[in-house]
Design a protein with these regions (language model features):
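Short helix/loop capping segments that flank catalytic or ligand/cofactor-binding pockets
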Residues: 78, 87-89, 101-104, 142-144, ...
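Phosphate-backbone binding interfaces of nucleic-acid-interacting proteins
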Residues: 1-219
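Conserved mixed alpha/beta core segments that line enzyme active sites in large multi-domain catalysts
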Residues: 50-78, 163-164, 257, 274-343
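Glycine/proline-enriched, intrinsically flexible loops and inter-domain linkers
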Residues: 5, 11, 24, 64, ...
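A short, flexible low-complexity segment enriched in Lys/Arg and Gly/Pro that occurs
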Residues: 97, 166-176, 244-249, 305-323
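A generic local secondary-structure boundary/capping motif
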Residues: 40, 80-83, 120-124, 165-170, ...
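Structural motif
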Residues: 76-77, 90-92, 130-132, 206, ...
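Short, solvent-exposed loop/turn segments at the edges of secondary structure
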Residues: 128, 173-175, 236-238, 320-321, ...
Length: 343
């Protein structure tokens, strides 16, 4: 499990505390922090800029000359080989003196960066260039966690991104994330609220839990949808709620940032909400399309002998009779209970 200190700071008062000292104290007190990850580590002096114009290089067909507004009195000129740039776009700019990571390793804890590149002004085929515009990879950002951003060429930022701001202020690159190595006896800490309560107890800090309220309206759910438990010895509670008139779209940026801090790829507001709640309170949950659930009924049961399921990652999985599944009204397994949904 990962713990974003920005997120944690909304639940418990950790303002002014040193992240490394906090990690050491938590570890000594039985809440081991395996790694302290700084997502923006290796990025220095990279700011946002707006492309004012794009012209062809006079002596190189594969190069373009861009004039950019980076929040200074005069525009800066950057020469690039990227073909996806055009006037009006907001892009990350690493000007002379800036630093960017040399590499991004998805297999390392938190996608740790290796090496460092210092940007210098220079000339490309005789034309001055004040630095470089950056791609996702050049900023050390895991493309898998940013499905809404372009993965090829220069990173094109949302059009409402302010000009001249440090890239660290975007996508929580200025966050600090703990990669936890929690043991089975501390399952209470496998959630942000659990970590907030533990952090508050250890450091004697005030904890403020989110206020939750639900307004029920519309037709009663009775007769429209139902849930059942066929294995009460293994599933103590199974409940559901029917949500109507849902418009599927992109989640707010702050939710996407919090999911990314845990290595979870944002999908859409429905899937993201389920993943967010799981991280916040530690309770796995899954969303189903009401129109596609046979019989509008769900039952928690053990898997049948030889039963298989195709999970959301596209993999066909052989189930064991000891596995709990959620089955629809046709008795087809629709989800591996508490683990992963299926088709």
């Amino acid at each position: 499990m990962n713990v974003s200190l920005k997120w944690l700071g909304t639940l418990v008062d950790i303002k002014g505390m040193n992240p490394d000292d906090m990690a050491e104290t938590l570890t000594v007190d039985g809440i081991p922090v395996e790694h302290v990850i700084r997502p923006g580590e290796g990025i220095k002096g990279v700011i946002t800029g707006k492309i004012l114009s794009v012209e062809k290089h006079p002596d190189a067909d594969h190069l373009l000359i861009c004039q950019l507004d980076v929040g200074e009195e005069e525009p800066v000129q950057i020469v690039t080989s990227a073909s996806n740039v055009k006037a009006g776009q907001i892009v990350p700019c690493a000007l002379s003196g800036a630093h960017v990571p040399a590499a991004h390793d998805n297999k390392a804890p938190g996608g740790l960066r290796h090496g460092d590149i210092k940007i210098k002004a220079g000339k490309l085929r005789g034309v001055k260039s004040a630095g470089m515009m950056c791609s996702l990879g050049e900023l050390g950002m895991d493309a898998n966690l940013f499905p809404a951003l372009n993965h090829d060429g220069i990173l094109i930022l949302p059009e409402d991104t302010p000009v001249g701001v440090d890239i660290h202020s975007l996508y929580d690159l200025d966050d600090v994330v703990y990669e936890m190595e929690l043991t089975a006896n501390r399952a209470d800490c496998f959630s942000m609220i659990g970590m907030a309560l533990e952090t508050g107890a250890i450091f004697r800090k005030k904890v403020t839990l989110p206020s939750i309220s639900v307004k029920e309206e519309g037709a009663p759910i009775e007769g429209r949808a139902s849930v059942h438990i066929s294995e009460p010895a293994y599933c103590k509670r199974f409940c559901g709620r029917l949500l109507e008139n849902v418009k599927i779209g992109r989640s707010p940026e702050w939710i996407e940032d919090r999911l990314r801090s845990n290595g979870i790829r944002p999908i859409n507001n429905v899937v993201d909400a389920a993943n967010y709640v799981m991280l916040e309170i530690g309770q796995p949950l899954h969303t189903y399309d009401y129109d596609k659930v046979a019989g509008h009924s769900l039952t928690c049961r053990h898997a049948h002998e030889g039963e298989k399921i195709v999970t959301l990652d596209g993999q066909e999985r052989q189930l064991n009779p000891s596995d709990l599944v959620i089955a629809d009204g046709d008795d087809k397994a629709a989800c591996v209970a508490g683990v992963m949904g299926g088709f």
